[in-house]
């Protein structure tokens, strides 16, 4: 009995002394959490949603933690030109069209005549604040003055591009200036503020009898401006965004050409690097045609614009490299060399032109604009017209030049 009591007493004392030590140990040693596994970034990681302020803009991709070679970086970068304080007339945007009336003001009682007068419009690259003032003088085929008109500055200033629109005035008496003959007419455009001649040239107006007109009335005709001379002339252009600029090649075609049947392939130093059939774009630009042409496709001129967005671009800022959508993009302004554009219609080659990129990160100046005194903000390209797609007269087109001004360096 006494022995049992001693054993029990010893057990109680052991428990009493051990409890404070155990309590102190639990307070001093915190519970260590298990580490959570982190996902490994992959190339399929999706960018964050675009914000409302910049819809459709790609978002920066996560920086790669790979120990491989670092991505390319640095310039040269494409720089968007600033609009000049002195207006720059852009001759490639000059459009001369005919406005016609189903009567002739000199024979008021004859309703079977068709008369016409010119209307023009053009763009000016300009960043100044003063209102633009221009006038146009028109000359008859014999060189005598036909009439003059003040041109309207429409206030259509595009803040993004620095482009302003100037065009013929809205004149209810324009029909009193109309004529009933075709031929080669002269035009002179003057900047009224300094009395400088910004452009002088000629345009050919063709008078023809439409097939849909009444054969009994020989003077029920139509008129159009002959634009065959545009076919051997192309332009290398750039469309600027914040981080990149898309190169655009502009060309003219004659006939009712379907854009879906066109394909433009881009070659660099002899190797194809892009095609509009794979992520590229073929867009219709300006269109000129005879109003009463009916089904005559030969009286239709259409500008097409070829580009390869996301495939080839001009890099403007280093930020562009952070966007997943551009990780495989070729930056042309960092790839000096020679480029060739070949255009196909239903698989048959119909156009070819070439341009170069200089070491300064922009189109190399081929000198055509400068030596022909054409103050465009684009690069003029000689275009080789191939095949039988276009029903045009190459000899007459070369003779006509650029609105009557011979252009050196072109290949008709």
How would you label these PLM feature ranges?
Residues 1-24:
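N-terminal export/membrane-targeting signals
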Residues 24-70:
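N-terminal propeptides/low-complexity segments immediately following signal peptides
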Residues 136-140, 189, 264-268, 343:
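Conserved aromatic beta-strand anchor motif in extracellular beta-sandwich/beta-rich domains
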Residues 142-163, 274-309, 355:
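Solvent-exposed serine/threonine-rich low-complexity stretches and specific carbohydrate-binding patches
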Residues 179-188, 335-338, 342-347:
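A glycine-anchored, Pro-Gly-centered beta-turn/N-cap motif
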């Amino acid at each position: 009995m006494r022995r049992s009591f001693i054993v029990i007493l010893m057990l109680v004392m052991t428990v009493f002394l051990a409890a404070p030590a155990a309590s102190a140990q639990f307070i001093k040693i915190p519970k260590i959490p298990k580490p959570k596994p982190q996902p490994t970034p992959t190339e399929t990681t999706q960018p964050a949603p675009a914000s409302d302020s910049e819809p459709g803009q790609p978002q920066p991709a996560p920086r790669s933690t790979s120990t491989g070679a670092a991505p390319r970086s640095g310039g040269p970068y494409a720089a968007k030109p600033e609009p000049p304080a002195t207006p720059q007339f852009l001759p490639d945007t000059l459009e001369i069209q005919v406005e016609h009336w189903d009567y002739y003001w000199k024979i008021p009682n004859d309703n079977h005549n068709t008369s016409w007068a010119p209307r023009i419009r053009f763009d000016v690259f300009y960043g100044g604040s003063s209102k633009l003032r221009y006038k146009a003088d028109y000359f008859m085929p014999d060189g005598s003055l036909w009439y003059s008109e003040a041109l309207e500055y429409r206030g259509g200033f595009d803040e993004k591009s620095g482009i302003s629109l100037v065009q013929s005035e809205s004149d209810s008496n324009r029909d009193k200036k109309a004529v009933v003959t075709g031929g080669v007419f002269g035009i002179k455009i003057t900047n009224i503020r300094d009395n400088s001649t910004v452009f002088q040239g000629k345009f050919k107006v063709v008078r023809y009898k439409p097939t849909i007109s009444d054969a009994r009335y020989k003077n029920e005709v139509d008129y159009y401006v002959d634009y065959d001379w545009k076919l051997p002339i192309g332009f290398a252009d750039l469309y600027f965004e914040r981080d990149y600029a898309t190169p655009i090649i502009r060309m003219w075609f004659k006939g009712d050409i379907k854009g879906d049947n066109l394909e433009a392939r881009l070659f660099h130093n002899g190797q194809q690097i892009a095609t509009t059939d794979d992520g590229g774009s073929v867009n219709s630009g300006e269109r000129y045609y005879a109003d009463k042409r009916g089904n005559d496709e030969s009286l239709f001129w259409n500008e097409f614009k070829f580009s390869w967005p996301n495939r080839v671009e001009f890099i403007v800022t280093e930020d562009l490299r952070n966007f997943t959508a551009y990780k495989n993009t070729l930056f042309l302004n960092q790839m000096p060399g020679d480029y060739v554009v070949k255009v196909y219609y239903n698989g048959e080659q119909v156009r070819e032109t070439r341009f170069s990129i200089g070491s300064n990160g922009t189109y190399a100046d081929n000198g055509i604009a400068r030596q022909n005194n054409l103050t465009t903000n684009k690069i003029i390209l000689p275009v080789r017209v191939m095949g039988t797609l276009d029903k045009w007269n190459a000899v007459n087109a070369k003779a006509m030049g650029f609105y009557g001004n011979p252009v050196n360096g072109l290949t008709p």
